[in-house]
């Protein structure tokens, strides 16, 4: 009886060894034509990189790729050879990183991307490698940040961006990758900050700029070539707006703590019931310069200066004001910088 058991054990061991040898021989096999056949495993420095099946050199079924620590990095399901492949990638903690399909090695259909905490970060849609359909981006907290629509790899239709917690930031419209139609930007609280029209990527018509309270502060008028033609400022007098052509304004002068006087180039004056700091926020500071803490001048009205000492200058203004205007410190340096050739003749 013992001899019989020994013979059976010996036969079992032999079978196991033969089976192992056959399995080893079946791994990473190349046929006489040099084509990969059957199960394959690739190792680098003793670490498994991927494993899968080949049939006539073409991947078939499930392929798995691995991180150096042995965890699954991605799984590819070869549905019809390499012409259609469903792919899922993973973070090292095991959570899904992305999911989607390749058709002829190009992204197709919906793709989704996730954080390592399993939060959806983006949704994308493709047609044979080209962006086609809705694209949505999310914050790591899961809030929507951006929505865009593509057709044939170009932006088309309505696009939106958001502040945190999905408050609207911008709404714009595209045709074939160019801005066309209305664009609106918002302050937090869904208050419009500016709005206007685009045509073929260029601003056109009247654009409105508002303050955080929703009050209109400035308008800009553009021609069909996107060139600005007119700018208007809105001064508030006891809560009511008064529209002024910016080209007619020479100076803004502080009057007490709560008022500002706009002095026009023809000498007329308009008194606003808002302080200078509030009005200055809406000036085009490429066209106005701070002469003193209490006075802003339109650039063309600053005709020159006379040095008083290293830290101060007397500013020459046209139309002239009723008093000498002395710029000091940073304001004096700024006035000097307007005249690169040095002190001009009065």
State the predicted function of each range.
Residues 1-27:
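Bacterial Sec-dependent N-terminal signal peptides
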Residues 227-346:
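Basic, polyanion-interacting recognition surfaces, primarily
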Residues 22-231:
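Glycine/tyrosine- and acidic-biased, solvent-exposed loop/turn segments at the edges of beta-strands
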